[in-house]
Amino acid sequence: MVFTDPPYNVAIEGNVSGLGRTRHRDFAMASGEMTREEFMSFLSAALANLAAYSIDGSIHFVCMDWRHMGEMLQAGGANYSELKNLIVWAKDNGGMGAFYRSRHEFIFAFKNGSAPHINSFELGQHGRYRTNVWEYRGVNTLKAGRAEELALHPTVKPVAMIADAIKDVSKRGGIVLDVFGGSGSDPHRCS
């Protein structure tokens, strides 16, 4: 399975990091400098590699900001066999950088290939009731340890959210791939 958080091609510095003590600089690439065509090419190449180097039937969770959901749908459609669902991560606080403060992020659930995929929740049959709205506290929530987490990455994904996604579509001892390591949530959860 894949859980990955590619750059969103959105400026970070002065846009996402706000005015607090922790200020983030733009990423090395895909921080708003790419044209739509360049970003499409970037996403398509990344997704093509994810599909090529993962098993047939695997589920790939790919995070993306609402500003580039069209590009993600197009790149995903070109590289995956199916869009299984569009998941909304509903955070408890809105972020910066938009006309309305965004209190959500999208997670695209794509299927790679035609083999059967793992589904450990099957509409609640295994005691796991899951919907396509995932409610997890964002790191910008006022809590102990928040400053350290925010210092790692401007859009840190909650470890519990990634852990649940891993449980949904993989088995113990399976392989989890994240080619955009970001804040390190995946390796932390898989350990």
Task: Report the location of each language-model feature.
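Core catalytic lobe of class I
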Residues: M1-S191
